[in-house]
């Protein structure tokens, strides 16, 4: 847990350094970065594959879980637009254990920056939790509340706004990854177990937050 909170602190420091209240405050080097609603291939892939995805996973899910997935799908534009509205942070975009190197077994060095974007900083925390820890309510609440404390000390944001950012973040990159890999042909998968494992992990968050 100490190591996890250390990661959260370090990624928050990056988020806070590159925090942009509005479009005017963007520094020149960040102006070319895309926001979620400008990353067109996310929604294109989801729209093209959603029916196939539901068909493939329906036997693994209960009726309420399928309803949750369909509700997310039907509200993608709203979700993406809200997560693309300022204030925004410079985000890693694919934060998970394999993309973190620990210097001296303590200081995290973040690797693989190919998904960088402007987004809500907590989107990095959400993906880190899904990909890197076993689902545990106490740990999840500890991490999310700790990040909120760091954020609240620097910026004016209500807990309701923060929770909305968390829920939206659950429905963007994690949802994209889930639909993508669970609709992929088996012969294209390097790890045939990953899609189902990711689906099951993500559904635990959906069942908890929605």
Annotated model-derived regions:
Residues 1-10, 20-92, 201:
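ATP-dependent phospho-/nucleotidyl transfer catalytic cores
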Residues 2, 156-172:
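All-alpha amphipathic helical-bundle segments outside canonical DNA-binding/catalytic cores
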Residues 15-19:
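Protein kinase-like catalytic domain
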Residues 1-4, 85, 115, 130-137:
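Short, charged/polar micro-motifs that form catalytic or ligand-binding hotspots
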Residues 27, 84, 154-160:
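Short helix/loop segment immediately N-terminal to the Walker
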Residues 192-200, 206, 210:
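Eukaryote-biased recognition of C-terminal alpha-helical segments
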Residues 74-121:
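Active-site acidic catalytic loop and adjacent metal/ATP-binding pocket
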Residues 118-155, 171-192, 197:
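Active-site activation/catalytic loop segments of kinase-like enzymes and analogous catalytic loops
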């Amino acid at each position: 847990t100490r190591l996890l909170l250390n990661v959260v602190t370090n990624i928050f420091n990056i988020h806070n350094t590159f925090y942009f209240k509005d479009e005017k405050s963007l520094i020149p080097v960040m102006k070319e970065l895309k926001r979620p609603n400008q990353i067109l291939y996310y929604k294109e892939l989801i729209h093209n594959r959603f029916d196939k995805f539901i068909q493939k996973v329906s036997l693994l899910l209960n009726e309420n879980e399928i309803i949750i997935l369909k509700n997310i799908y039907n509200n993608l534009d709203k979700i993406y637009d809200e997560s693309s509205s300022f204030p925004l942070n410079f985000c890693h975009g694919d934060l998970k254990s394999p993309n973190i190197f620990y210097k001296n077994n303590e200081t995290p060095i973040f690797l693989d920056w190919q998904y960088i974007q402007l987004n809500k900083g907590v989107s990095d925390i959400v993906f880190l939790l899904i990909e890197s820890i076993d689902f545990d309510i106490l740990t999840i609440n500890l991490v999310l509340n700790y990040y909120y404390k760091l954020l609240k000390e620097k910026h004016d944001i209500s807990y309701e706004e923060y929770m909305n950012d968390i829920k939206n973040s659950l429905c963007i990159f994690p949802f994209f990854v889930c639909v993508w890999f669970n609709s992929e042909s088996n012969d294209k998968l390097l790890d045939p177990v990953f899609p189902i494992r990711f689906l099951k992990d993500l559904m635990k968050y959906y069942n908890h937050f929605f």
